[in-house]
């Protein structure tokens, strides 16, 4: 079976080789692990964001950036485009922010292929029937500071690899790379909701594609989190090709999949988060979804479309 860590390593090698051009910094720690700063103490770049997103997806997706993105005739922004022939593995088996990395006073949400070695969370890998067996572990962290050896040692132990084979990429939410990689979760937001909220077998999703605008960079981490989530919730468009079975209600799946189907829909995410006392667990899971969904049922040939791009809320969120 394909290895998300080995595929992602090909991208990481390119990033290390072109670090100066990408405006990123590569540090080798004393335990041999490698930390790649993509926005903490460096500027990062558009290309670095594109490659970082590819790493998050385990190297199993094509990532591109349109400038300007064709969000609508009257409102255009640079946008991230995702295409994958391995939707379940690339989005849920790699990209999903499913590992809460906490060591001492360091905390970050971990995404990327190393999760398929540590099996975090195990339920996700049981659902998609996947586990990696690579001898290299690659993790991306959404954090405002860089991890030390204690963090990479923990990652090595959890993934059962040597510390020298651990590669950690870091980008704050409030950085350009952070903004790009969160918009790059547009397809994953849909597969996540299919599995976690609608309890649909995501292995039936054979191909997927999506596009979402890149949120303006905001130095305030909380406001940046709001804007980046809104880029997908109000501006993300996705396409899923599903091999259904008799009894699957794909029309209902499509109708319930967009963010607008959520009870909490209607406000910028920052406002929703603030009203929830900054507690993610108080927010309806169904809100984390793309704005618009198109599903092609490969068994029947039917096509279903639901949701819409909400330009008004997007512009309100972005301050336009």
UniProtKB/Swiss-Prot annotation:
One of its GO terms (cellular component) is cytoplasm. It catalyses: 5,10-methenyl-5,6,7,8-tetrahydromethanopterin + H2O = N(5)-formyl-5,6,7,8-tetrahydromethanopterin + H(+). The keyword Hydrolase applies. The keyword Ribosomal protein does not apply. Keywords: Cytoplasm, Hydrolase, Methanogenesis, One-carbon metabolism. Its EC number is 3.5.4.27. InterPro entries: METHMP_CycHdrlase. Pathway: One-carbon metabolism; methanogenesis from CO(2); 5,10-methenyl-5,6,7,8-tetrahydromethanopterin from CO(2): step 3/3. One of its GO terms (molecular function) is methenyltetrahydromethanopterin cyclohydrolase activity. It is found in: Cytoplasm. Its main location: cytoplasm. Transmembrane segments: none annotated. Gene3D superfamilies: Methenyltetrahydromethanopterin Cyclohydrolase, Chain A, domain 1, Methenyltetrahydromethanopterin Cyclohydrolase, Chain A, domain 2. GO terms for biological process: methanogenesis, from carbon dioxide; one-carbon metabolic process. It comes from the Archaea. NCBIfam families: one_C_mch. HAMAP family: McH (MF_00486). Catalyzes the reversible interconversion of 5-formyl-H(4)MPT to methenyl-H(4)MPT(+). Belongs to the MCH family. This is Methenyltetrahydromethanopterin cyclohydrolase.
């Amino acid at each position: 079976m394909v290895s998300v860590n080995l595929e992602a390593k090909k991208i990481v090698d390119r990033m290390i080789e072109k670090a100066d051009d990408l405006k990123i910094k590569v540090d080798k720690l004393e335990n041999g692990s490698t930390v790649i700063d993509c926005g903490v103490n460096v500027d990062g770049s558009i290309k670095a964001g594109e490659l970082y997103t590819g790493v998050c997806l385990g190297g199993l997706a094509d990532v591109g950036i349109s400038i300007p993105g064709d969000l609508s005739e009257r409102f255009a922004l640079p946008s991230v485009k995702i295409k994958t022939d391995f939707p379940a593995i690339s989005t849920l088996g790699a990209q999903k922010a499913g590992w809460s990395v906490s060591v001492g006073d360091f905390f970050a949400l971990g995404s990327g292929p190393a999760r398929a070695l540590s099996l975090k969370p195990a339920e996700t890998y049981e659902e998609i029937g996947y586990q990696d067996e690579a001898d290299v572990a690659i993790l991306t962290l959404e954090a405002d500071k860089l991890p030390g050896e204690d963090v990479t040692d923990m990652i090595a132990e959890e993934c059962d690899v040597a510390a020298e084979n651990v590669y950690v990429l870091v980008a704050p939410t409030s950085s350009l790379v952070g903004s790009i990689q969160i918009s790059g979760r547009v397809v994953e937001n849909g597969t996540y909701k299919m599995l976690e909220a609608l309890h649909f077998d995501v292995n039936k999703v054979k191909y997927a594609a999506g596009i979402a605008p890149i949120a303006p960079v905001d130095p305030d981490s909380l406001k940046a989190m709001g804007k980046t989530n809104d880029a997908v919730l109000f501006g993300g468009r996705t396409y899923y090709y599903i091999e259904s079975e008799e009894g699957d209600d794909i029309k209902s799946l499509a109708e319930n999949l967009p963010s607008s189907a959520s009870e909490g829909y209607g406000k910028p995410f920052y406002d929703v988060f603030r009203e929830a006392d900054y507690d993610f667990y108080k927010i309806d899971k169904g809100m984390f979804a793309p704005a618009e969904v198109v599903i092609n049922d490969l068994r029947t040939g039917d096509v279903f479309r639901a949701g819409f791009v909400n330009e008004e809320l997007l512009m309100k969120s972005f301050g336009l």
